[in-house]
């Protein structure tokens, strides 16, 4: 056997980084990484507080799935985001905190879009009629339940103004619409900060129907003071 070294023509060929196969493989890895990052951000990453809400989420096209942990007033509640729901283990592998300390800095305060409920007693002012009924209704309707929210904006109190939908035995229901239907709120009156998505006309028709039927707060007739006017008094 000859001990002479291999000639240059007999050496193993090297593969250039510009070889089409190398470029194709690199593009595949880059694309997979980009897709993974996108899917994680859109479907897996938890939105813990309003600070996690990006412009891409606040465009009215993204929905967040989670659980209502506390109802604070007639038109707002605390929301714990559970991306992926039971498919990603929420409720059986991943526990939702149930204590105030466990939920600290882990929830969104959601303000229902398009609706204003009667004001409860605070800042030395008495409660409006039907404020307690509105609170109890919202607690029974969404309290402890899984809901889907569509965020629109963040208000001056760092609340997420959003559409909320919940599954009931009659199907998926719009929470703001159901409050208006039952006369437990009015269409939001402020000149700024109002959010309706694409439902303003629908909400106004529901309010008018409840008014004609004297449902809830509309049973007060001429004595009714809307929440907006009450806050300005």
From Swiss-Prot:
It is a single-pass membrane protein. It is an enzyme of class 3 (hydrolase). The chain crosses the membrane at residues 22-44. Residues 62-220 form the TNase-like domain. Signal peptide: none annotated. One of its GO terms (molecular function) is endonuclease activity. Keywords: Calcium, Endonuclease, Hydrolase, Membrane, Metal-binding, Mitochondrion, Nuclease, Transmembrane, Transmembrane helix. It is found in: Mitochondrion; Membrane. Ca(2+) binds at residue 116. Its EC number is 3.1.-.-. The active site is at 111, 119, 159. InterPro entries: SNase_OB-fold_sf (IPR035437), Staphylococal_nuclease_OB-fold (IPR016071). Pfam families: SNase. GO terms for cellular component: membrane; mitochondrion. SMART domains: SNc (SM00318). Belongs to the LCL3 family. This is Probable endonuclease LCL3. It comes from Clavispora lusitaniae (strain ATCC 42720) (Yeast). The gene is LCL3.
